[in-house]
């Protein structure tokens, strides 16, 4: 189990599939994290109508503190969103969330993962680079709130079961 610094030895970080009941908590995170947050309807659509969509919630002590989503198409995963509550940032929780999303994608048979990130979001870019993502170009004027460019990044995923962890190291909750 993961232990979070400053939360004591018994504090466990949990990951689980997002449900419709999570949307109110996700909306709080969404509004804290993004200048152009998705709507409740967008999340509802993703969870009920998009068979390519996979979303997870990260909980600490039973409380949603982050979430991430991706579309899995053929052998590629496209990260749609990843965000952590403002009060929990700076504690490597975004990294843990990204790790879990990458593990899940590999488990589902995905070989590569892609995302777009604001060119001004250097903190996120450093995290993605640390996890093996490389820049593959720009989408000019991608963000409609300020016409900021998006950096396109790609990473190869390790085959499921060979992500650098020992077999049996992941515990079920």
Protein language model annotation of sequence segments:
Residues 88-91, 140, 149-151, 155-158:
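Acyl-donor (CoA/ACP) binding surface of acyl/acetyltransferases
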Residues 45, 120, 142-143:
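Positions that flank functional sites
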Residues 57, 78, 83, 92, ...:
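Conserved beta-strand segments that form the floor/walls of ligand-binding pockets within enzyme
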Residues 84, 90-104, 122, 126-130:
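Conserved acetyl-CoA-binding loop-helix of GNAT-fold acetyltransferases
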Residues 105-116, 139:
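Conserved GNAT acetyl-CoA-binding A-motif
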Residues 2, 7-9, 14-87, 98-108, ...:
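Acetyl-CoA-dependent GNAT
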Residues 2-3, 116, 129, 134-151:
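Conserved catalytic-core motifs of GNAT/GCN5-like acyltransferases
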Residues 19, 62, 66, 92-94, ...:
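Conserved phosphate-binding and hydrolysis motifs of nucleotide-dependent enzymes
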